[in-house]
Amino acid sequence: MSDVKILLVDDEKPFVETRMKRLKKRGIEVVPAYDGLEALDCLEKNSGIDVVILDIKMPNMDGMTALKEIKSKFPLVEVIMLTGHATIETGIEGMKMGAFDYLMKPYDTEELIVKVNEAAKRKRDQEEKIMEARIQAITLRRH
């Protein structure tokens, strides 16, 4: 899928920089953030973000708290949780809170790209359904 824009959130700057380079080579636009608070700020300032890649353990605002805020304020944005020191159960808990999926660190870039594309497609499908419902509602009001 082309024209995918993601927000990559992790407090490990070298990790973010390495992943950004790899994702950009694959045509994915990447906006970096280094904690949950910065992620929320980026979502408010950057339109068109399809997917958030969100680390769980971060300073200022951890990933689980950020996930709750993101899904509350930006319900259509899909979130993929990253678990390093956390457990699989933490990743599953994130999915119960609304995350699209999770990945265990270290993970394969190809696996991440597949999940990002699937999540972006789901977001765009949801946006399309909402638009169709709005058009239908307007059409019904006119008749």
Model-derived regions, located:
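Helix N-cap/capping motif at the beta->alpha junctions
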Residues: 32-41, 63
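Short amphipathic alpha-helix used as the core "switch/output" element in two-component signaling
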Residues: 41, 64-76
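Receiver (REC) domain active-site loop signature in two-component systems and cognate sites
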Residues: 58
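C-terminal output helix
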Residues: 107-117
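Charged docking surfaces used in two-component/phosphorelay signaling
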Residues: 17-25
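CheY-like receiver
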Residues: 122-143
